[in-house]
C-alpha cells in the first residue's frame, strides 16, 4: 500500500566532511566519510550523515552483532575484527570532536555555490579574483566528463544545474573559449538549451535580464495577507518553502534588473550561446497537466494575475509589502540567520535591499555575517554549504558512542557529558516558532539541527536528541528536558497518526500543482522514516517509565523539576505516549509497501525508511493489540532487506528509486546504507544471521585508516554516493529532468 508522498529527489544531496579534510579527491569520486552512521550500524540505531555520522552508524551495528556473535565459534575472528574497527572508528570520532560537539561539512551539488556567486555579484558587481579562483576550482572539480553538472555524484547531467554553473563561471571571468565551458555549452545545447530551465533557475536569470520576468509565474505580495486557516496561505507551505517564498514576494514585486560583466541590459545577450534560438529565446510557461483540474485552475489564476499586472497597482500592495518586510525581520535570528539555510538568507537580504535597506544596516550586516559562516574552503576550493547540522551530528554521535562496549569506557568519558550539556543548552525554550500558528498550546521543547534556527525545530532532531539522553542516563526519562521534548513531539502528531519533519498538518499537496512549483516540494506531510524514529523515541521512553524511578547523577544539569518522577506524573506521560503510538502504528501499517518496505523521504530511500520503521516497531512487537501485525510486517521487511543485499555483503540504493520504485534497494554498496540495513535486520535477527555476518564483514573490509589525521589508531569509511536528501534548498530538480 502506498502510504508515502512520491516527489522527485531534491538537488541538495548532502555529504559531510571533517574540516581537517586534506583529500584531493572529489565528492564525485567518493571523498565523503562515514562515521556516525556506520558506527551505529556496527552497534545498532539509525543516523543521518556526516564525516562524523557514517562511522558511528557502522560502529553501532558492529556492537549489536558482536554481542551475539560471541556465541558462535566460527564467528570469533570476525568479532575480533569488528571490535578493532569499532575502536578505530571511536578514535576517529574523538579526532573530529571540537568545542563540545561535532559538526561536519554539509556538501551539496554546485547550485548553492553558483547562487552565492550570483548573490555576491548582485551586491558588489565584482568578485574578488582570489576568491573567484577558489570558487572556479571547486566548480570545475564537480564537472562531469561530458561537460555537465549533475544533481548528485555519479548522476547524469542536469540542464538547470549546468546552466547555473556556466553562468557562475562566466561571472568570475572564465572565457567561453575554455575547454570546460565549451563542453558545458555543448551539453546544455544538446539537452535543449536554456528553454528547459527549471523555475528557480529562471528567477535567478531574470534578475540579470537573461530571461524576461514574464516567464516567471505571478507571486503577488498579498499572499502574505491570506489568513493561516485558509487552505492556501504561507503557513500551508513547508517551512523551507515558506522561508523562501516570503522574500520572493518582494523580489517578484520589484522585478529587479542587475548588471552582468557586459553591463546592464533588459534583454541581456550574455548567455546567448546557450539558446538554440537566441533571436526568440522561447520559454515554455510551465508544464501543468491540462487534464488535471487543480493544475488547470492554478494556471488560469496565474494568467489572470498576469493580465492584471500581478496586482502591482492594488491598493493593498503597499501594506502587503510592509507585512512581508515585517515577517522577514521577525524571522531573522539574533545571529543573522534565516531558517538556518542559505536560500532564504540570500533572498531575505535581496528583499530588504529592494525595500530600501542599505548594505550598512544591521539586518543586512548580520545576514551577510551569517552567510559567511556557511562558507567552506580547503585545498579543493571554496564553496557554500546550504545548511549545517551540528545538533544532528552531535546527538547521533553521542548515541552511537554510548552503544560501544563498556570496556571502551565511553559512558564515563567527560567529553560525552560535555556534548550532552551542549545539546541541552541548544534545546528551544523561547517564544519563536512557526509551529505555534497551528499548535499554540503545546509545550516548547524541540531542537533544530542548526546552530541558529529558533523558528524551525524539527521532530526528527528532537526524537534523536531524546534518544541520546535516554541512552546515556535512563533516569533522564523523568527529566523536564525529556518531558517537554516528548510533549512537543506528541503535540505535533498529524491526524493520520504520522509525523512530518517540521510542521503539523502540512499536507495540502494540491499546492504542488501551482505553476511556480516545478519541483513538487512545497509540503511537509507525514513520512514513515520520521514516524519510525519518533516511535523509537517514544517506545524507549515508555519502557523506561515503566521501570522503578532511579536517581540521575546529573539531574539538576538537565533540569529535573522538584517532585518530578512520581507515579502520577509517570502514568500521565505513559498515557500520552501510548495514545500517540496507538495512532502511529496503524499509519505505519497502512504505509508499508507491497514489497515489505517503507519509503524514506529524508535519506535514500527504502533501505533508510525500512530501517527506521523497524527500529521503532521493535519496541511494540509484543504489544497485545498490534503484535501479530508488527511481527508479520517486520518479517516481510527483513526478508526484503536480505533479498536486496549485494554480492559484496553490503547494501546500496540510488536516488533513481524515488522516480522508479522498482529500483528500491538497487545500487552499489555504501557504508551508510549497509549500516541502515543491518540495524533493521538486527531488530529481528541475531548476530549469527548470515546476512548480518556478510554485512559486518563488508564494513570491516571497507574501513579506511588513511582518512585519519592522527597516528594510525583511527579510521573511518569513504562514502562514494549521496545517500541523503535535503529539501531545504529550493534548487530542486527532477532526476532525469526533460
From Swiss-Prot:
Pathway, per record: Secondary metabolite biosynthesis
Catalytic residues as annotated in Swiss-Prot or TrEMBL: 460
Gene3D superfamilies, sorted: 1.50.10.20
Site residues, Transition state stabilizer: 392, 449, 602
Regions annotated as coiled coil: none
Free-text function comment from the UniProt entry: Squalene hopane cyclase; part of the gene cluster that mediates the biosynthesis fumihopaside A, a hopane-type glucoside that enhances the thermotolerance and UV resistance of N.fumigata. The first step of fumihopaside A biosynthesis is performed by the squalene hopane cyclase afumA that catalyzes the cyclization of 3S-oxidosqualene into the hopene 21-beta-H-hopane-3-beta,22-diol.
Name by which UniProt lists this protein: Squalene hopane cyclase afumA
Organism: Aspergillus fumigatus (strain CBS 144.89 / FGSC A1163 / CEA10) (Neosartorya fumigata)
UniProt gene name: afumA
Amino acid at each position: 500500500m502506498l502510504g508515502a508522498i512520491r516527489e522527485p529527489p531534491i538537488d541538495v544531496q548532502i555529504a559531510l566532511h571533517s574540516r581537517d579534510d586534506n583529500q584531493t579527491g572529489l565528492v564525485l569520486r567518493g571523498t565523503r566519510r562515514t562515521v556516525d552512521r556506520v558506527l551505529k550500524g556496527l552497534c545498532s540505531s539509525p543516523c543521518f550523515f556526516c564525516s562524523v555520522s557514517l562511522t558511528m552508524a557502522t560502529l553501532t551495528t558492529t556492537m549489536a552483532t558482536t554481542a551475539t556473535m560471541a556465541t558462535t565459534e566460527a564467528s570469533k575472528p570476525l568479532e575480533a575484527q569488528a571490535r578493532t574497527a569499532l575502536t578505530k572508528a571511536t578514535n576517529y570520532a574523538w579526532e573530529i570532536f571540537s568545542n563540545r560537539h561535532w559538526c561536519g561539512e554539509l556538501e551539496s551539488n554546485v547550485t548553492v555555490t553558483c547562487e552565492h556567486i550570483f548573490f555576491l555579484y548582485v551586491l558588489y558587481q565584482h568578485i574578488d579574483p582570489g576568491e573567484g579562483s577558489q570558487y572556479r576550482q571547486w566548480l570545475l572539480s564537480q564537472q562531469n566528463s561530458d561537460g555537465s553538472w549533475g544533481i548528485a555524484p555519479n548522476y547524469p547531467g542536469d540542464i538547470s544545474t549546468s546552466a547555473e554553473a556556466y553562468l557562475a563561471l562566466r561571472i568570475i571571468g572564465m572565457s567561453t573559449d575554455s575547454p570546460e565551458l565549451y563542453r558545458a555549452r555543448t551539453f546544455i545545447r544538446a539537452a535543449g538549451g536554456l528553454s528547459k530551465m527549471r523555475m528557480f533557475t529562471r528567477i535567478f536569470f531574470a534578475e540579470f535580464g537573461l530571461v524576461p520576468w514574464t516567464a516567471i509565474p505571478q507571486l503577488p505580495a498579498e499572499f502574505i495577507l491570506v489568513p493561516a486557516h485558509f487552505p492556501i496561505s504561507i503557513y500551508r507551505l513547508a517551512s523551507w518553502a515558506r522561508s523562501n517564498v516570503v522574500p520572493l514576494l518582494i523580489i517578484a514585486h520589484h522585478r529587479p534588473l542587475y548588471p552582468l560583466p557586459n553591463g546592464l541590459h533588459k534583454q541581456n545577450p550574455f548567455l546567448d550561446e546557450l539558446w538554440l534560438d537566441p533571436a526568440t529565446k522561447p520559454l515554455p510557461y510551465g508544464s501543468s497537466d491540462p487534464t488535471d483540474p487543480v493544475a488547470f485552475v492554478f494556471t488560469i489564476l496565474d494568467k489572470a494575475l498576469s493580465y492584471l499586472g500581478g496586482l502591482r497597482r492594488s491598493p493593498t500592495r503597499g501594506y502587503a509589502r510592509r507585512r512581508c518586510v515585517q515577517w522577514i525581520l521577525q524571522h531573522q535570528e539574533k545571529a543573522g540567520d534565516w531558517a538556518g539555510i542559505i536560500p532564504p538568507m540570500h533572498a531575505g537580504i535581496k528583499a530588504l535591499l529592494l525595500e530600501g535597506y542599505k548594505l550598512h544596516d544591521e539586518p543586512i550586516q548580520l545576514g551577510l555575517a551569517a552567510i559567511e559562516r556557511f562558507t567552506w574552503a580547503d585545498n579543493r576550493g571554496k564553496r557554500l554549504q546550504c545548511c549545517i547540522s551540528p545538533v544532528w551530528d552531535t546527538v547521533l554521535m553521542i548515541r552511537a558512542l554510548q552503544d560501544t562496549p563498556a570496556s571502551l569506557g565511553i559512558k564515563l568519558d567527560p567529553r560525552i557529558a560535555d556534548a550532552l550539556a551542549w545539546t541541552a543548552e541548544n534545546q528551544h525554550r523561547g517564544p519563536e516558532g512557526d509551529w505555534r500558528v497551528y499548535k499554540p498550546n503545546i509545550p516548547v521543547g524541540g531542537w533544530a539541527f542548526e546552530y541558529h534556527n529558533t523558528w524551525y525545530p524539527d521532530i526528527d532532531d528532537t526524537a534523536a536528541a531524546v534518544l541520546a539522553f535516554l541512552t546515556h542516563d535512563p533516569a533522564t526519562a523523568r527529566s523536564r528536558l525529556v518531558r517537554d521534548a516528548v510533549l512537543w513531539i506528541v503535540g505535533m502528531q498529524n491526524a493520520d497518526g504520522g509525523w512530518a519533519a517540521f510542521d503539523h498538518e502540512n499536507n495540502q499537496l494540491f499546492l504542488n500543482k501551482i505553476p511556480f512549483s516545478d519541483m513538487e516540494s512545497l509540503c511537509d506531510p507525514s513520512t514513515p522514516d520520521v514516524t519510525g524514529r519518533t516511535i523509537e523515541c517514544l517506545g524507549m521512553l515508555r519502557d523506561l517509565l515503566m521501570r522503578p524511578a532511579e536517581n540521575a547523577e546529573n539531574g539538576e544539569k538537565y533540569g529535573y523539576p522538584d517532585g518530578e518522577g512520581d507515579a502520577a506524573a509517570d502514568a500521565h506521560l505513559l498515557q500520552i505516549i501510548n495514545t500517540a503510538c496507538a495512532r502511529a502504528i496503524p499509519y505505519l501499517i497502512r504505509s508499508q509497501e507491497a514489497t515489505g518496505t517503507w519509503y524514506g523521504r529524508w535519506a535514500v530511500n527504502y533501505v533508510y525508511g525500512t530501517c527506521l520503521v523497524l527500529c521503532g516497531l521493535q519496541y511494540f512487537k509484543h504489544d497485545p493489540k498490534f503484535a501479530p501485525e508488527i511481527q508479520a510486517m517486520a518479517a516481510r521487511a527483513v526478508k526484503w532487506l536480505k533479498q536486496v543485499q549485494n554480492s559484496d555483503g553490503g547494501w546500496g540504493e540510488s536516488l533513481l528509486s524515488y522516480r522508479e520504485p522498482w529500483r528500491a534497494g538497487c545500487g552499489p554498496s555504501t557504508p551508510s546504507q549497509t549500516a541502515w540495513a543491518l540495524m533493521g535486520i538486527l531488530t529481528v535477527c541475531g548476530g549469527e544471521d548470515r546476512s548480518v555476518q556478510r554485512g559486518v564483514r563488508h564494513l570491516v573490509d571497507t574501513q579506511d585508516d588513511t582518512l585519519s589525521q592522527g597516528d594510525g589508531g583511527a579510521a573511518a569509511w569513504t562514502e562514494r554516493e549521496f545517500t541523503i536528501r535535503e529539501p531545504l534548498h529550493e534548487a530542486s530538480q527532477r532526476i532525469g529532468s526533460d
